[in-house]
């Protein structure tokens, strides 16, 4: 759990609203947001900033933004994707358990699933949902882990040169 002030300190953003409000989780999908989560609008095929009001209506207590006007509690940042990654880097430092990074051309998801199946009855383990193995999915996986996690299994995929190195900096 982070306060909005924590998010501002981590991202270098500017707070709009109540800095003491507590955020419990992060989502990039306004349809799937849970109560008191931080909504991070991402620019992709659709601009996530267009869905801030939906996220707030569905329970988000705060949102990041790099364009447009804030709605309720918000943090203004230069780039929402970089801010998401910065939050994940911060949270990763709070997780004291081991990180198992899975990379490769073929079989990443299968390997991740086998590792999870092998460890889940022995210890507290956290694993990515589906194939969350890119610059969005990896931070979301880290941000959804408990700080008490003993083994964090992260799948990392590359679409081009240097991408694994960038993901490793987050992990």
Task: Write out the residue ranges for each language-model feature.
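N-terminal leader/targeting and accessory segments in enzymes
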Residues: 1-86
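Phosphate-binding loop of NTP-binding sites
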Residues: 84-171
């Amino acid at each position: 759990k982070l306060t909005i002030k924590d998010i501002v300190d981590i991202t270098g953003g500017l707070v709009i609203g109540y800095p003491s409000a507590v955020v419990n989780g992060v989502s990039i999908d306004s349809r799937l947001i849970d109560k008191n989560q931080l909504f991070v609008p991402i620019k992709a095929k659709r601009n996530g900033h267009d869905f801030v009001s939906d996220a707030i209506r569905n329970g988000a207590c705060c949102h990041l933004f790099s364009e447009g006007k804030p709605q309720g509690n918000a943090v203004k940042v230069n780039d929402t994707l970089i801010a998401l990654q910065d939050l994940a880097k911060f949270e990763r430092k709070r997780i004291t358990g081991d990180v198992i990074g899975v990379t490769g051309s073929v079989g990443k998801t299968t390997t991740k699933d086998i590792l999870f199946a092998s460890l889940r009855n022995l210890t507290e383990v956290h694993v990515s949902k589906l194939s969350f193995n890119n610059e969005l999915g990896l931070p979301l996986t880290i941000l959804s882990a408990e700080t008490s996690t003993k083994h964090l299994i992260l799948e990392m995929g590359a679409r081009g040169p240097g991408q694994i190195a960038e993901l490793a900096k987050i992990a």
